[in-house]
Amino acid sequence: MIRYIFLGLAILIGVPVMLLSKTISTPLGAMLLAANDDGLAGAWFCDQRHLPDRTAFSEVTQQRWLDHAQRELLAYFDGRLRQFTTPRSAVLGTAFQRAVWQQLCELGHGTTTSYGALAAALGRPTAVRAVAGAVGRNPWSIIVPCHRVVGSQGQLTGYAGGLPRKQALLTLEQALPGVTQSG
């Protein structure tokens, strides 16, 4: 089902934006995908933290980036996709958050890193908490692989979609914490 969603000023930069959205089924639960003409604006598990307000939805027809993201997510879960190509629309987040999210895209399939290593890679080694906050607000679950960030000792730490999902994603990628850590 595809719907319109209106995201308020509280989570957007500048002005309100009308996005198309679609709810899809995945092996780890339903996901809400949202897009505009520029690309995918978000991908959230329907029961995760930081899910946008869904009260202003109204149904529409297909949308190319939603369909593209759906195909890629299903291929990922089938083990046929290791890197996403769906363009992302930068309607969410601050400049710092967007920099963190872009850095997350550098993490290879089957690897993990720590919040500290991620902060260092951004040239902000003392900004570990700010980096962790940005990781937690990532609007593109799975597509921007925040699930690949673990604690400094390789332990599973927060994930907006829940730790069982994070564990399942790392297992799917065969990247159990502490085994293939890259930082």
Model segments located where?
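Basic nucleic-acid-binding alpha-helical/helix-turn surface characteristic of O6-alkylguanine DNA
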Residues: I5-T126, A175-G183
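Active-site phosphate/pyrophosphate- and oxyanion-stabilizing loops and adjacent acidic/basic residues
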Residues: R71, R129, Q167
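Regulatory, non-catalytic segments
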Residues: R129-N138
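Major-groove DNA-recognition helix of helix-turn-helix-type DNA-binding domains
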Residues: P139, I143
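Short cysteine clusters
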Residues: C146
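…primarily DNA-binding HTH/wHTH and HhH modules…
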Residues: S152-G183
